[in-house]
Amino acid sequence: MLVKTLGAHFAAGQNAKKCSCCALLISLLCVLLLSLNPLPVTSHVTSAGSSTALSSDPNLVLVNKCCEKFEIHVDHECQQVNETDYFQPMFTSYGGEQNRPVKFKFVIGIPNCGSMQMWPIYHYAGSSDKLVLLDDGRLRHYTNAENEAEERHGIQSDYEEDIAGSLEPLYHDYDKGLYCIDKATSSTGEENVLFANICLARKEIKWSDSNFLLRKILNPIFHGISLVILLVIAIIYFILPTLRDLVGNIVTTIAMCLMVSQAADLVRIFTELTSHVSFIVADIILCFSLLAAFFWLNSFGFYIWKTFRSRNVFLRVTDGRKYCYYSAYAWGCTATMAALAVFAHFFLDAESYKQEHMVGEQETIGWLGICIFFAPIACTILVNIFFYVTTRKLINRRTVYGRIAHKLKANFIMFSLMLLVMSIAWLFLIMSWLQMEGLLYAHIVVNALQTPLLLYICVLRQRHVTFLLKKTCCYNEPPSANDWGDELHYMNGNDY
């Protein structure tokens, strides 16, 4: 049995005209987006002649073919074959009479499903799915048919919820433009296989399916929980006055960047069945926010490394100016690399490659853009490892610690743990794009654990942070006689 994932081949590749003037390009794109109506299928007619001549013949039946006329599906892609192996459709009447003589024309291309979901169907000997091409150009899809008599006398289904106790639907008819059909073979020698891409108005939800539960139910829930946790971290470091130093501002910014990435990934989950513009915009925002988070983490590591190397250490004296410098570095590098990645995707990446690597009907950021987005992240991780190793050596050489040294050491430990957690989550994100279900499930689990670990690292593990939270939240309690404030209370307690 063939694997039920098959990249359909776009027949009429359109070469987008590139304009050097940015304003003109933006205006043209706006006009095109407003004026274009969704077509029923991305296709072209194989024979010469005008569309008027084709539509004027009432006996001519248009058949939507996935590949070119001289191609069939071989191992998940369209390949050219000999003329003897061409796909010859067999038409069946509504009464079940097979091999009907019908005058037809091929319309090449996969269906433009729009908001509906494209779904691959295979018809081979012994399969539960049967594909029948009707003599008016419609495609009939039989499901759960046990024999041919049951197929011919099946009950039509509109994929709506049936009343309890009624019979299950046995077939559904797809109009022209909502399907494409073709012949399929495999290198293992499986012949006489029919393949079709159909547009499902509503995919049947199987709540017992672990894949559906993990990807469409638990994954969005995990993203929502992560958004709440990151918001809590950002609020704590932004509201408490004693935490609003340079390190606190950096942690707040990293939390906000990760919030944007989680929100963009959540949008990607729910836009797989909608306009490709929303999907690719969410893809770009996801990569942009992750890149910004790692540049800010790199700024955090540089600050700690430079402070430990400096002999004259003064905290919170020029934090505002330093934050401006780090902001210029982090946001400037992020914006530059993001602009290069977007430019490379739209203008340098091959059009055929972008058409072959899609999620359903949605265009995604290509590997060229991903490399430009994520190569700097790999570089910042390596630089941060250098900061960690050299700073660790400097800490081991110290024999005397004061309050400032304890606080710097606590910040160094927080930086190290954040680097470890964020790097592991980033690696699993990359591996999840390798089209392997196991890696995707691992990424969902790791992404769900990332933000609770960050909450522990940045808040729960920091005793002075929990002390400030208790002092701020429990303001109605009578003041303790031993309460000397945050700075004096932890001057020699080594609670950082």
UniProtKB/Swiss-Prot annotation:
<feature type="transmembrane region" description="Helical; Name=6">
    <location>
        <begin position="412"/>
        <end position="432"/>
    </location>
</feature>
<feature type="transmembrane region" description="Helical; Name=7">
    <location>
        <begin position="439"/>
        <end position="459"/>
    </location>
</feature>
<keyword id="KW-0325">Glycoprotein</keyword>
<feature type="transmembrane region" description="Helical; Name=1">
    <location>
        <begin position="220"/>
        <end position="240"/>
    </location>
</feature>
<comment type="similarity">
    <text>Belongs to the G-protein coupled receptor 2 family. Mth subfamily.</text>
</comment>
<feature type="topological domain" description="Cytoplasmic">
    <location>
        <begin position="388"/>
        <end position="411"/>
    </location>
</feature>
<keyword id="KW-0812">Transmembrane</keyword>
<dbReference type="GO" id="GO:0004930">
    <property type="term" value="F:G protein-coupled receptor activity"/>
</dbReference>
<dbReference type="GO" id="GO:0007186">
    <property type="term" value="P:G protein-coupled receptor signaling pathway"/>
</dbReference>
<feature type="topological domain" description="Extracellular">
    <location>
        <begin position="1"/>
        <end position="219"/>
    </location>
</feature>
<keyword id="KW-0807">Transducer</keyword>
<dbReference type="GO" id="GO:0007166">
    <property type="term" value="P:cell surface receptor signaling pathway"/>
</dbReference>
<feature type="topological domain" description="Extracellular">
    <location>
        <begin position="433"/>
        <end position="438"/>
    </location>
</feature>
<keyword id="KW-1133">Transmembrane helix</keyword>
<feature type="topological domain" description="Cytoplasmic">
    <location>
        <begin position="460"/>
        <end position="496"/>
    </location>
</feature>
<keyword id="KW-1003">Cell membrane</keyword>
<dbReference type="GO" id="GO:0003007">
    <property type="term" value="P:heart morphogenesis"/>
</dbReference>
<dbReference type="InterPro" id="IPR000832">
    <property type="entry name" value="GPCR_2_secretin-like"/>
</dbReference>
<feature type="topological domain" description="Extracellular">
    <location>
        <begin position="349"/>
        <end position="366"/>
    </location>
</feature>
<feature type="topological domain" description="Cytoplasmic">
    <location>
        <begin position="241"/>
        <end position="246"/>
    </location>
</feature>
<keyword id="KW-0675">Receptor</keyword>
<dbReference type="GO" id="GO:0016020">
    <property type="term" value="C:membrane"/>
</dbReference>
<dbReference type="InterPro" id="IPR052808">
    <property type="entry name" value="GPCR_Mth-like"/>
</dbReference>
<feature type="topological domain" description="Extracellular">
    <location>
        <begin position="268"/>
        <end position="276"/>
    </location>
</feature>
<feature type="transmembrane region" description="Helical; Name=4">
    <location>
        <begin position="328"/>
        <end position="348"/>
    </location>
</feature>
<feature type="transmembrane region" description="Helical; Name=5">
    <location>
        <begin position="367"/>
        <end position="387"/>
    </location>
</feature>
<feature type="topological domain" description="Cytoplasmic">
    <location>
        <begin position="298"/>
        <end position="327"/>
    </location>
</feature>
<feature type="transmembrane region" description="Helical; Name=3">
    <location>
        <begin position="277"/>
        <end position="297"/>
    </location>
</feature>
<dbReference type="InterPro" id="IPR017981">
    <property type="entry name" value="GPCR_2-like_7TM"/>
</dbReference>
<keyword id="KW-0472">Membrane</keyword>
<dbReference type="GO" id="GO:0008340">
    <property type="term" value="P:determination of adult lifespan"/>
</dbReference>
<keyword id="KW-0297">G-protein coupled receptor</keyword>
<protein>
    <recommendedName>
        <fullName>Probable G-protein coupled receptor Mth-like 5</fullName>
    </recommendedName>
</protein>
<dbReference type="GO" id="GO:0005886">
    <property type="term" value="C:plasma membrane"/>
</dbReference>
<feature type="glycosylation site" description="N-linked (GlcNAc...) asparagine">
    <location>
        <position position="82"/>
    </location>
</feature>
<dbReference type="GO" id="GO:0042594">
    <property type="term" value="P:response to starvation"/>
</dbReference>
<feature type="transmembrane region" description="Helical; Name=2">
    <location>
        <begin position="247"/>
        <end position="267"/>
    </location>
</feature>
